[in-house]
């Protein structure tokens, strides 16, 4: 089992959600976050003064998936979230030691 964490542009969330649902992913967690990478930030004018905006709005999504669909899901996220411009984001894949469904007590892949 793997935990996929992806940082994407906010306007890509619905497309990514649909793409992974089409593969069979039944659950996703999305969080509004701020960050920067190579994109850095940008400057804005406010009341005649220039300000540097370092942190840009992004969306972090987290999905627990079975190893059997890992590559499909990662590929779907990358292809769907890509705009070809700086700031498209990143995908991180981590091992999951255990998953427990609180309601039923199911564990492992059955709990995903």
Task: Mark where each language-model region is.
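Positively charged, small/polar-rich N-terminal and surface patches that mediate targeting and assembly
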Residues: 1-112
């Amino acid at each position: 089992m793997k935990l996929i964490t992806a940082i994407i542009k906010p306007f890509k969330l619905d497309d990514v959600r649909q793409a992974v649902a089409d593969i069979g992913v039944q659950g996703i967690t999305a969080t509004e976050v701020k960050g920067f990478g190579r994109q850095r930030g940008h400057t804005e004018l406010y009341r005649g003064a220039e300000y540097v905006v370092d942190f840009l709005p992004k969306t972090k999504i987290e999905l627990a998936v079975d190893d059997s669909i890992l590559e499909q899901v990662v590929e779907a996220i990358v292809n769907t979230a890509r705009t070809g411009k700086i700031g498209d984001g990143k995908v991180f894949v981590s091992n999951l030691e255990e998953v427990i469904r609180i309601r039923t007590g199911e564990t492992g892949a059955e709990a995903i």
